């Protein structure tokens, strides 16, 4: 297993009206984050907030290229980012204990926080296709170039962990500074992760290592 200190490249926020950051995703242009009763978008080039959608947004957030997916209590909502309309709803596998959310080549990966699990599910039905175990509490989840990464938070320590999506074996860890929490997690598809900062109200960009 490879292990290194995480390199924080930039901090965004806190943002007006958003006391906490839950899920985080990236639509290719804007970073979206969940703040409880809203989905908020900002421009990572300028750090400026650009829009918000009034919708329940309690945990993980994902983007499939067209739609946003958002955990709200015990369900996952499919949302049209143009109109803010909820198009469909499926049950969340953790029944309200869910954390991170990631779109991955036709399926969703869903973190289960205290259960220390990550479920791969069918985005149409919510059916669980696979479950892998984590070594710590699971926060955000992201999928990039065939790699499955998730955030952890336990004992006042956080890291970004890359795991084998078949077995759950830990392949790589990036340790964040003590007290820096990772809530949501997303990749920009290249060299950065966007990490939700929980009650700090911030989103941090962290360098993604290239193997």
Give short role names for the model-derived ranges:
Residues 31-37, 68-74, 110-115, 150-155, ...:
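Conserved beta-strand positions in repeat-built beta-propeller and related beta-rich domains
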Residues 40-41, 77, 119, 161, ...:
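WD40 beta-propeller blade core
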């Amino acid at each position: 297993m490879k292990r290194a200190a995480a390199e924080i490249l930039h901090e965004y926020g806190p943002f007006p009206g958003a006391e906490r950051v839950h899920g985080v995703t990236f639509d290719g242009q804007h970073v979206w984050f969940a703040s409880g009763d809203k989905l908020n978008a900002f421009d990572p080039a300028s750090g400026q907030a650009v829009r918000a959608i009034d919708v329940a947004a309690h945990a993980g957030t994902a983007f499939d290229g067209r739609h946003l997916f958002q955990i709200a209590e015990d369900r996952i909502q499919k949302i049209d980012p143009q109109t803010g309309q909820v198009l469909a709803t499926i049950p969340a596998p953790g029944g309200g204990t869910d954390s991170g959310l990631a779109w991955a080549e036709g399926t969703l990966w869903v973190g289960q926080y205290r259960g220390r699990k990550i479920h791969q599910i069918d985005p149409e039905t919510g059916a669980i296709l696979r479950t892998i175990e984590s070594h710590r509490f699971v926060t955000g989840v992201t999928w990039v170039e065939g790699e499955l990464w998730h955030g952890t938070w336990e004992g006042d320590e956080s890291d970004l962990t890359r795991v084998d999506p078949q077995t759950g074996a830990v392949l790589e860890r990036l340790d964040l500074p003590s007290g820096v929490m990772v809530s949501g997690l997303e990749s920009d598809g290249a060299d950065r992760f966007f990490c939700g900062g929980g009650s700090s109200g911030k989103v941090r960009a962290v360098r993604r290592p290239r193997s």
